[in-house]
Amino acid sequence: MPTGSLNEIVHAALSGQVVSFPTDTVPALAVSPPYSSLIFAAKKRTFDKPLILMAASAADLWDYVKGNQEEREIWQQMTEKYWPGSLTLVLPASEKVPKALNPKNPSTIGIRVPAHAIAREILGRTGVLATTSANLSGQEPLLTPSAIMTTFPSVTVLASTERQAWGIINSGQPSTVARWQCQGWDVLRQGAVFL
């Protein structure tokens, strides 16, 4: 599939197609959550490596997690400190999360709000998307549109002209992943944010 404008990326995502756009960390593959299996197939990804939900704001994500009032206050403090940004929180999943996002452990879900203007513009128009880094499973993230198009020819990739207009820069470093564990955080992957 060719590159697309921002409007074409939004339309493709809303139509259940896999798209790619830059984030503050590495470029993402993204799809509407009910179509998550398309990303697993494209990446040749095993089901023990879940996808995450990405949104334009924290408010868009709270319905996808469940916890008591005290836990939610702790989680919101983390998001107020680090979001938008390069921190993925793994929290207990609500019934709203499609099991296809985390087939091996549907009781949890990773959530993130990127600190990237164009990613948040797209997510603001599409709503929450299931995402992962743009790469084949087990390989390094792809950082350029041409590499993404070569590896994933059926994915609509945000056009270079759109990237230039927005001054797009990826850090190239993945997000930090922290999982909530009974009153505390367990860092599963150290990335751009240090906890």
Predicted regions and their residues:
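Active-site-adjacent structural elements in enzyme catalytic cores
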Residues: 1-195
